[in-house]
Amino acid sequence: MSGWSGPLARRGPGPLALLFLFLLGPSSVLAISFHLPVNSRKCLREEIHKDLLVTGAYEITDQSGGAGGLRTHLKITDSAGHILYSKEDASKGKFAFTTEDYDMFEVCFESKGTGRIPDQLVILDMKHGVEAKNYEEIAKVEKLKPLEVELRRLEDLSESIVNDFAYMKKREEEMRDTNESTNTRVLYFSIFSMFCLIGLATWQVFYLRRFFKAKKLIE
């Protein structure tokens, strides 16, 4: 990122900049490392919006020295099980795909081997949306000046924020519709239960009346 100079630098980031970081910073970048034992499977899941570019880089450190025929399989799927990326005997590489729908995506690493083998160290760096775009490459292809590149980045950032707000509004409307539907069902069920209780109470009154008449306890 380009640095600020002058009075703005002393004042620190403004509310709008903090909002950008809050909305896009944590959600568009996933950088994680973990240990993967032999003959085990670990998966990471993340919800990603529709029509977003997703890029990633991974590196798997093999500390076994090739012993035990250790192999690691990397597979990326959506909630329907469609394979977006797959790599047998993965060690180091990159991947990229574009989402077609808002969905939950799963990145799985599976290790297979024999014998006592040290755990593998897996490093995964995954980005999507604005963070996934290579603006240096875009600048070269479109012959953009540095200022134009920053303007393009801000334009994409603004569009992403607008899409996030639109999605949150849509989810809010869906949740409100669900709540209204649930309240309506609860109301109907309450009315039905009330009529059932009234009917049961009426039946009990007539039944007891006939019973007492049969026993000649009442006329």
UniProtKB/Swiss-Prot annotation:
GO terms for biological process: COPI-coated vesicle budding; cytosol to ERGIC protein transport; Golgi organization; intracellular protein transport; positive regulation of interleukin-1 production; positive regulation of protein secretion; protein localization to ERGIC; regulated exocytosis. It is a single-pass type I membrane protein. Coiled coil: none annotated. Pfam families: EMP24_GP25L. Keywords: Cell membrane, Cytoplasmic vesicle, Endoplasmic reticulum, ER-Golgi transport, Glycoprotein, Golgi apparatus, Membrane, Methylation, Protein transport, Signal, Transmembrane, Transmembrane helix, Transport. The chain crosses the membrane at residues 186-206. The modification Dimethylated arginine is found at residues 171, 176. Residues 204-219 are annotated as: Interaction with COPG1. InterPro entries: Emp24-like, GOLD_dom. Glycans are attached at residue 179. Residues 41-193 form the GOLD domain. Residues 207-219 are annotated as: Interaction with ARF1 and IL1B. The keyword Transcription regulation does not apply. Residues 207-219 are cytoplasmic. It is found in: Endoplasmic reticulum membrane; Endoplasmic reticulum-Golgi intermediate compartment membrane; Golgi apparatus membrane; Golgi apparatus, cis-Golgi network membrane. A motif (COPII vesicle coat-binding) lies at residues 211-212. Belongs to the EMP24/GP25L family. Ectopic expression of TMED10 alone does not result in its proper cis-Golgi network localization. Interaction of TMED10 with TMED2 is both necessary and sufficient for transport of the couple to the cis-Golgi network, and TMED3 and/or TMED9 contribute to facilitating the process. The GOLD domain is required for proper p24 heterooligomeric complex formation and efficient transport of GPI-anchored proteins. The lumenal domain mediates localization to the plasma membrane by partially overriding the ER retention by the cytoplasmic domain. This is Transmembrane emp24 domain-containing protein 10. It comes from Oryctolagus cuniculus (Rabbit). The lineage of its organism: Eukaryota, Metazoa, Chordata, Craniata, Vertebrata. The gene is TMED10.
